[in-house]
C-alpha cells in the first residue's frame, strides 16, 4: 500500500526496477534465440559430418555403366552438399552466434550499471520523503500539546514549511532530470538490442536458406544424370560379355609315351609332359582358378592365394606408404616383442647417437631439411633393398631427421585418424585427449606415445639452447605428421589448433605412457653407430694394413696369405672382416702350405645395425724397408709374439710381366699426415696453455709497472720535500727527475713494442704450423751497444766538467766509477772520442741534468751522492738558472735527441 503524508499519497518509488525488468525480459528472449541458433548449427554440422563419413566409406561400384555414373554423381553431390553445409555453419557461428553471445553479455553489464544508478536515486528520494514525514510529525505533536511553548511551535512550523518546499523541489528535479536520464539510457539499450536481433535473424535466414538451395541443386544434377541412363546399352554390353565367355576349347588328343618323352626319355620328357598338361589346364581356366607359366595355381577364393600374398609381404622390404599393420606383420618374425615399427626406432636412435650423442643439440633439427638426394638415397636403401646399414656419407642429422618426417607423412592414414580430427582439436587438456586416444588403434597409440617421449626429450632446455627448437617450433613441425585436414579451406584456419594439440601430447607424455606402455625388447641398446661415422677423415669401413716393400721394376710382387680359400668359402654366408696382411683368421692354416694371392676388397654385406659392434682387427707390424726376407720374417714374428700367435711367412712370386714397383699398404691418403682427434685435442690444449701463460706474464708486467709507478711517485714526493727544505731554486734536480721519468717511459714503450713484435711472430708461427727457429744472440752487437753507452756517459761527464771549469766552479765527481775510470780529459780528447760514433755535443747542452738522470737510473751509489753535489753546486745553480732559463727547452731537447741515437739492445725471445 502507498503511504500518505497528510492528504498527499506517496509514489511506490520503483520506476527503475520496473523498467529494468522489461529490459531483462528482452535479454532473456535474445538468449533463447541464440541458443536455438547454436543448437541448429550443431545439428546441421553433425549431419554434414555424418554425410561426409558416409561418402568416404562408400566404395566405388564394381560395374561400369550408366547406373554407376549416376550413383557416383549422387555420392559426389552429397559430399559437396556436406562440405557446403559445414562451411556455412562455420561462417554462421563466426558472424552470428559468437558475436551475439558477446553482445548479450555486454548489454547485461550496462543494464546492471543503470539499475544501480536507479537504486541510488530511489534511496535519495526515500530520504527526502522520510525527512518530510518526521518534520510533519514533530509539528503535529507540538500543536496537539497544550503545554508546548509558542516559540517552539512556531519553529517547528517553519521547519515543516521548509521541508515541504525542499521535498517539492527534489520531486520536480527527480521527474524532470534524474529519472528521464536513466530512462533514456535504458531505452537506447533496448533499441540496440532489437536492431541487433533483427539483423541476426536476417543473417540466419540468408545462411540457412543456401543449404536447401545447394541440396536442391545437387538433387537436380543427380536427377538429370539418372534420366540419361541408357538401360538398353547396358543390357547389350552385358549380353556381349556373356557371349565372349562361351568360346570352344581345343579338342583333347591322344599323346603316346614316345611323343611325350620325345625319344630322349628322362627328365626332359617329363618336363615336356608337365608343360603340355599345364598348357591344357591354362586353356580350360575352370572356375576362378588357373595356372601360371611358372607353375603356381592362382585362385581368388582359396587359402593358397592368402598364403602366397603373406609370403610376398614378408619378402617385400617396403616400409613407406603402406599401413602400419602391414609393417608390423613384416617385422613380427624378426622382432616378435617390438610394439612399434623398427624403422621408427632406428631413425630416432640414430638421431640421438649421431655426433657423439649430440644429435638432438643440432641447430635447426627437423626445421632445416636434409639434401633431397641424400634423403632419396636413404629411402631407396630401406624401401627397395631393405638395407638398414647406410654408407658413411649418409650418416648425417638433417637427412635422417627429414627421412623420419617423410615416413610419418607418407603413411596412408595419419596417426590421429580423420574421424576424431575435429573432436581432438577441441581438447584443452591431456585428459580430454586421452578419452579419444583410447579409441585409436593399438599401433597408433604406441607410435604416438613413443614419438611424444622422443619429442619431450628433444625440447628439454639443454637441447633447446643449441638446437633453437623449442616446444612451439617442434609442435609446428610435427603437426602435419600427427594430423591431416581434408578440407582445403580449413587447413590454414586450424594451424594453431593443431599445434596446440601436439604441444599437449608432448607435454603429457607421462600420462600417455601410463595409458599405453611400450615394449621395445631392448632394441635401443643394440642400435650402434658404425665406427666410420665418427671419423670424417677415415670414413671407409674396411682398410688394408700391409707391409711396405720395394722390388725391382721388372718384377711384380704378390703377397699370398694362408687360409684365403677358407675365407672365400665363408664369404657367402658370413660378413667378411677387413682383410689385413696378418690376421687371426689366417693363422689357422699350416705355414708351409702355399695359397693363391688375395686382393683386398671392400665387403658389402655388413652386419645389421642392431648387432653389437665387433672388436677391431689386429694391428699390422711396422713397415719394413729393404730388409732381407729372413730378417723380415723374424721381425714380424717378434712384433706379433705379444698377440699370442705366429703369423705365416710371406711368400713372393715372380711374374713375367714388366710392372712398376709395388708398395703394399699405401692407402689413398693425402700426402700430409692426418692427425687424429686426440692429437688435435692435445694441440688445442697446448695452445690454450700458451695463451694462459702469456696472460699471466701480462698480468705480472702490469703489476711490475704499477710498483714502478708507485716508487716513482714516492721518489717525486721525496724530491719535492728535499727541494723545499734546501731552497726554492733547486730546479736542476727537478729537471733530472723529469728526464729520468721520460727515459723510463721510453724504455717501457720500447719493451711494449718488442712484446708486440714477439706476439706477431708467435701468431705467424701458429698459423703456418711450422717450428720457429731459435734466434741466435749476437754478442758483438751487445758489446757495441755497451761501448756506446759508456762513451755517452763519458761525454756527458766531460762536458759537465768543462762547463764547471769555464764558470769557475769546483769540480766534484759524479760517481766513484766515473771518477776512477775516466780522469779529466782535454777538449781535443773529447772530440776524438765523439767523432767516430756520435756527432759532437752542442755548447748549450745541460750536462748536469743528464748526468743526474743517468746516475739515478744506473746504480744506487749515484743517488747517495746527490746531497753532496747539491751542496757544492747550490750557489752556482742560482746564477745558471738566471742565465740559462731561456735555453732550458733547447737543452732538454738536445739531450733527448742524443739519448734517442743510442741503439736499443737486441731482443731475445
Curated annotation (Swiss-Prot):
Transmembrane segments: none annotated. Residues 675-716, 742-765 have a biased composition (Basic and acidic residues). Residues 529-909 are annotated as: Disordered. Residues 1-257 form the F-BAR domain. Residues 533-562, 571-602, 723-741, 786-828, 843-892 have a biased composition (Low complexity). It is found in: Cytoplasm; Contractile vacuole. The keyword Cytoplasm applies. Residues 322-513 form the Rho-GAP domain. GO terms for cellular component: contractile vacuole; cytoplasm. Residues 651-674, 767-785 have a biased composition (Polar residues). This is GTPase activating protein homolog 4. The lineage of its organism: Eukaryota, Amoebozoa, Evosea, Eumycetozoa, Dictyostelia. The gene is mgp4.
